[in-house]
């Protein structure tokens, strides 16, 4: 299992629109991906409600895990983008 640590760039964190775009990208990838705060349990990253429930704010770190390195790289790029600005 590979993992990546990324800092959330969206101004409101992973809430509403950014969480939706992220969860949709995970689901579309077809890969099993988890997300969580460092040192805390991870959840299914394809669930928008679970992602929003993490309460991840702007500038916070999250850890992504998956068997698919390519998907992880794409998701890191997505989270490093201010999804509220698009």
Where are these regions (language model features)?
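Intrinsic-disorder/low-complexity, polar/charged segments enriched in Ser/Thr/Lys/Arg/Asp/Glu/Gln
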Residues: 1-5, 61
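Compact, glycine-rich, soluble single-domain proteins
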Residues: 7-56
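Long, low-complexity, intrinsically disordered polar/charged segments
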Residues: 4-7, 66
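C-terminal structural segments of small proteins and small subunits
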Residues: 52-86
């Amino acid at each position: 299992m590979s993992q990546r640590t990324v800092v959330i760039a969206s101004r409101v964190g992973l809430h509403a629109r950014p969480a939706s775009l992220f969860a949709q990208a995970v689901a579309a990838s077809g890969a099993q991906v988890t997300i969580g705060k460092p040192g805390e349990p991870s959840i299914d990253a394809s669930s928008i409600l679970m992602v929003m429930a993490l309460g991840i704010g702007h500038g916070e770190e999250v850890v992504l895990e998956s068997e698919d390195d390519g998907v992880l790289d794409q998701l890191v790029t997505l989270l490093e983008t201010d999804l509220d600005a698009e």
